[in-house]
Amino acid sequence: MIRTVHIAKYVIPEAGMLLRNAAVHVSDPGRISRLEPWQSPPPNLETKVVDWGCAIILPGLVNAHTHLELTHLPGQEKRPASFTQWLAEVIREKQRWSRADIQETIIRGARQSLASGTTLLGEISSSGISREALKHEKLRKLIFEEVIALTPEKAGEAMAALNQRLDRPDPDAFSSSSVSPHAPYSVSPELYRATAELARARHTRLATHLAETKQELEFLASGTGEFRSFLCGLGALPPGWMPPGLAPVAYLDKLGVLDLPAILIHCNYLDEDSMVRILSRSCSVVYCPRSHAYFGHEPHPVRRLLDMGINVALGTDSLASNESLSVLDEMRYLFRNRKDLKCDEIIRMATINGAVALGFGNVLGRLRRGYWADMTVLRMPEGLADRNIEAQLLEGAGECLATIVQGRIAWTSAPGMLTGGA
């Protein structure tokens, strides 16, 4: 059996653990066979040793929420006047793009992600072409086919199109598909129920944007405010539409969405009842720290969510509201700006929590025997003090040296490492 051994000065098998001068053994077909202190093995033609030197090997970083379709839309330096103004601008820009434009921007975003250490991402696809665009990209993708329809009469039409997209075979071994009703202000109750039933029947995840803004809370509670004006301006608010009169989480709970292992994106504004409801289900929350800051939201309740035991993963959102698609940049932002979060919590959110959210928690997110060998390798400065390694990493020491997916080097800044097909 052919075996590859990856060695480095530091290995983080999972958050809260650190090994020094360690080796990760990978056997065909790309699973971890063991971790151990490094000792030179006897010569063996079936063993290839990849020495990353002064580096950290950690579980592959997981971007649990992104929109690669918006990679062409760099966020403005100036904060938008309102969320709906920003949303309207995104809609206008997207209407100008051709299919080729969208495909190119998706590929560009995937390659930026891979080069920053991401091995698995949750991609929202509103165009329906993400799976085809990403078929040659060497990272894992869970692609959420997005649906939008606030008019009840359009729910059937939206579901027919969604089923058609989901029935297409996955184009590569690293792709799988799921469903994403966009948000409570853009999806009718009928469509939410139908997508939840579809996700249940297909044994897959459902992702939805939720409790993202105060204006969303107002719209669902009373039907007034910024979102009403926005939807009326688009001609998207059905005649006689009535608000549910509930907080976003309670609303989706009533519709049965929380009965699934749902992925609740953002959750910037949650009351205690909402958090208790999330805790009582097998749902995950995805926190997008720098996008959250871009819109000037109040502090995210991530500390409370973690204390309650809710699974919180990290996402970058899109370049329309962020500076990069790097999960490592999100981690470092949190280290600088959320002093209430510990290093191991930040690492956990970027690895195993993301894997759990996307449904890969039993095979990804840790460096453990039997798990897929998805790893991020970060080059560390020579002469680094041999203490508080995780803190130094999050302070900014280290840059992405390689991204390894299923035991194969998918990207590296050291091209010589690609020789031999490791």
What residues fall within each predicted segment?
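His/Asp/Glu-enriched, well-ordered alpha-helical/loop segment
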Residues: S229, K254-L258, Y287, E298-L384
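Alpha-helical scaffold segments that flank or form the walls of functional sites
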Residues: I56-I57, P74-E137, A158-D172
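C-terminal cap of metal-dependent C-N hydrolases
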Residues: V356, W372-A422
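Glycine-enriched alpha-helix->loop->beta-strand junction motifs that scaffold or abut catalytic
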Residues: E137-K141, A196-H203, V257-L260, R277-V286, ...
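Active-site gating loops and adjacent loop-to-helix segments of metal-dependent hydrolytic enzymes
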Residues: H72-E104, K138, L142-I148, T213-P261, ...
